[in-house]
Amino acid sequence: MNRIGKQALFVLATVLLGVVTITIVAQTAKPKRINQAIELLTEGQPIYYTGSHSGTTGTYEQGVKDAQTYADYISYDMEHAPFDVKGLQEYMRGLAAGGPDRSGHRTPAVIVNVPVNGMDAAAVHANAWMFNQVLATGVHGVMLTHADDPGAIRAFVEAVRFPIHHEGVGVDGLPEGRRGVHGVATAAQIWGVSQEEYEEKADPWPLNPNGELLLGVKEEDKYALANVDENLKVPGIGMAEWGPGDMAMSLGVRAQGAAAVQDPKMVAARAKVLAACKANHIFFLNSFSAKDVVDMIKEGVMVGPASPETAAIGRKYTNRPPPF
């Protein structure tokens, strides 16, 4: 064999060794929870997600591929992308078939942006069927968009909870859950648990310390901003974002990108949402980049979209132990 051939063989062997190593680590890792995003947050580790507002390809094949993502969770957009529950169901089946993921979890966590605007409780109640259908596919969390009003957020938490759970009921007017039992069988299959175990675990964390659902709200317009202190007091919410794109439009800021974020009105809006998150022990979501991820973490950002490079920098800074 000539020199070039030997070099090619060495490269191939190195790649195969890496694949085998990842597989062995995933198989030997023993996750503490079903939802890796929650597991990491309980350990004080920031979490990094992948996904875009253009949507995720809702197919079994894409799910198999994404099962080995670098990210801590997958943001699956159905707010602006089509509301295709069948596609989401096939995607979740693919994730389960392609797992375990790199951290040893059965699947990466999936959190869905559902096209329900939280303008008021009536709007959320009228569209609660969307949460039922999405959760039945076995996802691990849901984001409520334009969460403007505390009544809307209470209705959101109500819609995703089974009535067998009572943590927080009556606190700040939180009602009993209204989620129905049908759909449990399909979700339990994705999680790899019995139907009874799914019913016990499919509850919002950290309201329920043993819950495996991560709920988030988007405080992304001037109406939400006016109510943000009360909004984030509602029990059951785990994370919140300030949605700079929609916030800029709502505040009349016509600049784009960094120029918009640096506008004084935007700086004040972000600071208000961050302060409300800290006051209510809710994790703040903000975009990360390779240049600012360390500073963001120091500021208190615990959730955000990130490239593989950015996630690697953040994980190194916080001394996150492998596998990931």
Residue ranges and their predicted role:
Residues 1-12:
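Bacterial N-terminal signal peptides that target proteins for export
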